[in-house]
């Protein structure tokens, strides 16, 4: 009887698993990125990026290493010569930030952005 109920429940209530569509442009400030928790937004500019599926993260790690402004630490910014402060994106889905000079007006605007988007 239990086997019959189990078999009929899968027939009556089929589950459809769809893969996330991780294509197109995105904003590093968008939560969840790319309209799906299964995707990640990789910035190519301060406010714009492209969507990827996490299986492509090894190529993303290489891109972060090669991108002059993407960073994971202040030391990385100094090593790349693109600033001395790594400002993290206010998005839990993004594990890196953007390099700034710590006394720049651009940094002040970037740090004010999360407050502006949550109001």
UniProtKB/Swiss-Prot annotation:
Q: Which residues fall in a coiled-coil region?
A: none
Its function, per the record, reads: A1b binds to basic 7S globulin (BG) and stimulates its phosphorylation activity. Involved in the signal transduction system to regulate the growth and differentiation as a hormone peptide.
Supply the name of the protein: Albumin-1
Q: Which InterPro entries does this one have?
A: Albumin_I, Albumin_I_a
Q: What is the effect of changing residue 48 to A?
A: Decreased binding to globulin
> Which Pfam families is this protein grouped with?
Albumin_I, Albumin_I_a
Q: Which residue numbers fall in the propeptide?
A: 57-64, 117-119
Where does the source fall among the domains of life? Answer: Eukaryota
Species per Swiss-Prot/TrEMBL record: Glycine max
